[in-house]
């Protein structure tokens, strides 16, 4: 694409918080639970980004000249873990104390992944666990410059449904 002669920029969003999105709605539902059983105790690094920030940055990228081939990592201002993110959603959206988190050892989960892939509609699959294990955090400097401000952190998402 970059070699096509067209001016190309790449947007790489982290985990996106946006009501109506399948993964976001799943996280909101999980955050209602007082006890969570999460692979590896939910110790996967995340830096969730609000959908409004992504949309605003994409609009700005369409109108602001960025260097050809620029990659903008779109991540929120708060680095957290999956377990902490679910606790933040529980506290800010549901006004409940942080959930108890029990760790599901990866060794016990792996043999069940073909079945969990089917019953979870792909949310709990070998691929999704691989993505979680890789983490989804990034420097937000370029993203903040495109936005013209710091991106929202997960603790602020409830203000902008």
Regions from the language model: what does each represent?
Residues 1-20, 29:
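Conserved beta-loop-beta element that borders a ligand/cofactor-binding pocket
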Residues 22-23, 40-63, 70-73:
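Substrate-positioning beta->alpha
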Residues 27-39:
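A short C-terminal helix-loop "cap" of Rossmann-like NAD(P)-dependent dehydrogenase/epimerase domains
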Residues 45-52, 72-92, 103-114, 150-153:
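Substrate-binding strand-loop-helix patch
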Residues 55-62, 86-89, 154, 158-161:
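Hydrophobic "lid"/C-terminal helical patch
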Residues 61-76, 96-101, 126:
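Core catalytic loop region at the nicotinamide-binding pocket of NAD(P)H-dependent oxidoreductases
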Residues 90-134:
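Terminal hydrophobic/aromatic helix or amphipathic segment near a protein terminus
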Residues 134-161:
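Amphipathic terminal alpha-helices
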